[in-house]
């Protein structure tokens, strides 16, 4: 928890203080008073009755003593329960395939008033220009969009080709930006543990801010060393005892439930009254279809309450106050005097039914957000331009030669998890000894003209066809999986033609595709249109076999070398446990 930076974010002038205090004392008129409301007490449990009094961006007072206070406008909450605005502790907005402007339109009416975003997806493609665009979006947003400065671009040096670098000098230029809360996830945990100076330089430069971690499955002395370096949190835990040990060692735990990585069921039993200040909720990567149909952080709160019997005040605590404290955002996370008036009114607190949202003291209207979306997007000056520097491919580019009797490594997918297993399969004249083995390839898209890196994939469920995408963490090269080289080539050529995007091929034809014109990562369509297109893509993909719930998000992590156990980058097969490249053929 980093309270030393609170002054940076709590922008309030002396004149604003005087006006706020006058309303608190009852000597001046409030801007808004919310009547007929109960406030969920996140500290003690239970509820506080009485109005919420707002002046400007801030709460001037709470409680029955303000029942007769004057206001310019009164809001009748109709018996609703008021809770602080929800906070996502760690996400990559790009993974929603929405721009930050569209993301705000889709999630703010659901109560998501604050996000802590690491824009390392677009930074890996476009470098500092991508970070600058996210900062512009954050500056103009109604939603509190805070940024962690991307620390690992690329994710792991020398393991992949990406589109740009983001040097320490460039990082430092953004450190004091008003929307920056700290240093984003330090994914090269072996480098931190071994004391590599280049990585320690980054930690030292941001040590007065919040230092995000990334250490899936880490334990023992290595975990102790990683925490000793100053890392404060982790969102990659996927086992109960792993999460418990990190909490015991003083690390804050971000409980993640995204579209591919689903760790809430495994980790929710850890949450209790004692450790909840050290627990937070995050999505990491969540697609627009799930946001539209299930929700965002509101969906996670609902599951904590309904499926895991977490008390109301604890569930809402980990969705707001705990995260605000961790990042030094002490003006957020509570409905109390002097706090920013980010308020969610719930007609049903157990079902997280959002009735109305206020952010920075102003009611939010979903229709107004939608009507203003295109103008606000244009104002942010998105970095348009084709980022795909790759010539069309042919089936021969994916030709692999196998020798009967030999054993070959297979990337084994675990549905709804980002980790994979390293398996092997024996080849014979009739094919592999497992019928679920298909092909995977990664093609760099930044003009280096490398031959595709090819491998084998098991457990994905692809019985026919091919899927291709330019969303491929973290370097975002082209990843394609398929049953035939011809269909793989067709899918790849479609995303090249689109300037980036997603594609499904079956029966020798493109069944569905989605162009992503911003960095090959994001669409400029509305959230509703994007959700409909994702629905069509998923329907087409389901015709190819019993795939993961979110096949494109699951596929996007098959190239990320910092998550074990076996991955494929543009440079070849990578052993994520030994942190070294390995061969397709098993020779040991």
Swiss-Prot record:
Signal peptide: none annotated. The keyword Hydrolase applies. GO terms for molecular function: adenine deaminase activity. Its cofactor is Mn(2+). Its EC number is 3.5.4.2. Transmembrane segments: none annotated. Gene3D superfamilies: Metal-dependent hydrolases, Urease, subunit C, domain 1. Keywords: Hydrolase, Manganese. GO terms for biological process: adenine catabolic process. It is an enzyme of class 3 (hydrolase). It catalyses: adenine + H2O + H(+) = hypoxanthine + NH4(+). NCBIfam families: ade, PRK10027.1. Homodimer. HAMAP family: Adenine_deamin. Belongs to the metallo-dependent hydrolases superfamily. Adenine deaminase family. This is Adenine deaminase. It comes from Escherichia coli O6:H1 (strain CFT073 / ATCC 700928 / UPEC).
């Amino acid at each position: 928890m980093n309270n030393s930076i609170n002054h940076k974010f709590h922008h309030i002038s002396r004149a604003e203080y005087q006006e706020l205090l006058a309303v608190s004392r009852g000597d001046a008129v409030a801007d808004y008073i919310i009547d007929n409301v109960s406030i969920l007490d996140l500290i003690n449990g239970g509820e506080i009755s009485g109005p919420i009094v707002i002046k400007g961006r801030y709460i001037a007072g709470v409680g029955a003593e303000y029942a007769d206070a004057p206001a310019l406008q009164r809001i009748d909450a109709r018996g609703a329960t008021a809770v602080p605005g929800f906070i996502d502790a760690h996400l990559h907005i790009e993974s929603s395939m929405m721009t930050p402007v569209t993301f705000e339109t889709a999630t703010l009416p659901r109560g998501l008033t604050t996000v802590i975003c690491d824009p390392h997806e677009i930074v890996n493609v476009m470098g500092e220009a991508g970070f600058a665009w996210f900062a512009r979006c954050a500056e103009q947003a109604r939603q509190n969009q805070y940024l962690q400065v991307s620390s690992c671009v690329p994710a792991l040096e020398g393991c992949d080709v990406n589109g740009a670098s983001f040097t320490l000098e460039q990082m430092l230029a953004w450190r004091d930006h008003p929307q920056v809360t700290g240093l984003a996830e330090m994914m090269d945990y072996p480098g931190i543990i071994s004391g590599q100076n280049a990585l320690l330089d980054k930690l030292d430069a941001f040590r007065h801010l919040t230092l995000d971690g990334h250490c899936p499955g880490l334990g023992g002395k290595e975990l102790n060393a990683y925490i000793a370096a100053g890392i404060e949190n982790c969102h990659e835990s996927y086992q109960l005892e792993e999460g418990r040990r990190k909490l015991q060692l003083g690390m804050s735990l971000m409980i993640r439930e995204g579209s591919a990585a689903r760790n809430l069921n495994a980790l929710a039993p850890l949450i209790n009254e004692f450790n909840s200040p050290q627990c937070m909720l995050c999505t990491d990567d969540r697609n627009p279809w799930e946001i539209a149909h299930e929700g965002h952080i509101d969906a996670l709160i609902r599951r904590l309450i309904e499926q895991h019997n977490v008390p109301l005040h604890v569930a809402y605590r980990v969705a707001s106050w705990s995260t605000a404290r961790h990042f030094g955002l002490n003006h957020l996370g509570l409905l109390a005097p002097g706090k920013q008036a980010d308020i969610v009114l719930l007609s049903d607190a157990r079902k997280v039914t959002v009735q109305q949202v206020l952010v920075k003291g102003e009611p939010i209207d979903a229709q107004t957000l939608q009507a203003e979306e295109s103008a606000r997007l244009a104002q942010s000056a998105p970095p348009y331009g084709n980022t795909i520097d790759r010539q069309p491919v042919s089936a021969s580019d994916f030709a692999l030669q196998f020798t009967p009797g030999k054993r070959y490594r297979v990337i084994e997918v675990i549905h709804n998890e980002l980790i994979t297993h390293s398996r092997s399969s024996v080849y014979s004249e009739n094919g592999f000894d497992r019928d679920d083995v298909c092909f995977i390839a990664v093609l760099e898209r930044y003009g280096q003209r490398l031959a595709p890196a090819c491998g084998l994939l098991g457990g994905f469920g692809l019985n026919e066809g091919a899927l291709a995408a330019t969303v491929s963490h973290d370097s975002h090269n082209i990843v394609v999986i398929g049953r035939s080289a011809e269909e793989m080539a067709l899918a790849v050529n479609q995303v090249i033609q689109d300037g980036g995007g997603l594609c499904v091929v079956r029966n020798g034809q493109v069944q569905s595709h989605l162009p992503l014109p911003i960095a090959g990562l994001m669409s400029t369509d509305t959230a509703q249109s994007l959700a409909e297109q994702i629905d069509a893509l998923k329907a087409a993909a389901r015709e190819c076999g019993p795939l993961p719930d979110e096949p494109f998000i699951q596929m996007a992590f098959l190239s990320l070398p910092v998550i074990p156990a076996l991955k494929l980058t543009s440079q070849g097969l990578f052993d994520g446990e030994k942190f070294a490249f390995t061969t397709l053929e098993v020779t040991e």
